[in-house]
Amino acid sequence: MIETPRLILRPFSPEDAGDVLEYLREPLVNCFACMKLNTLEEAQAEMQKRLPQTEYCFAIVEKASGKVIGEIDGHPESASPEEKAPTDTVSPCWMMHKDYHGKGYGYEAACAFFDYLFVDKGIRRIYAYTEDYNLSCQHLCEKLGMRREGLFLEFVSFVNNPNGTPLYENTIQYAILKKEWEGRK
């Protein structure tokens, strides 16, 4: 469990299903379209999948209300496709209920998560992808001190166009090294 002044980052529990359904009923960006949930039963099944994920996957809980308002997780890279052991590089993913945007919760959660990754898990490098239209995520990456490393044109498709063809999105990559993170404090 990770605590900040206003938040608790903790593993998911079965009781989180209703709160998670609220923000995954209508994902705000296409990269989360595959995570869309339609019913409480689907959300409960999703919570069961998340129960064993306690090291890099956390519910973001608002302390004042006890409500799950989002999630943050990290995906350690493997050294090679043949190896299962993670390297010292992680790609985080964060998602927040739309009612909690613009309140600094994403920044607060990401700062705590980055501290956890760099200090507790010994991570050397964190990189994140975001769509070119997701300006709030780009702003968050920059506020975290991440540098923009590149723009990948028509990089990936998460959804289809109305005619059924893939909708390829432009993706921006941001990154920060542990020494850069430590130097910003």
Segments and roles (model prediction):
Residues 1-31, 57, 61-185:
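Acyl-donor (CoA/ACP) binding surface of acyl/acetyltransferases
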Residues 28-49:
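Conserved GNAT-fold acetyl-CoA-binding loop/helix
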Residues 51-53:
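Soluble sensory domains of the PAS superfamily and closely related sensory modules
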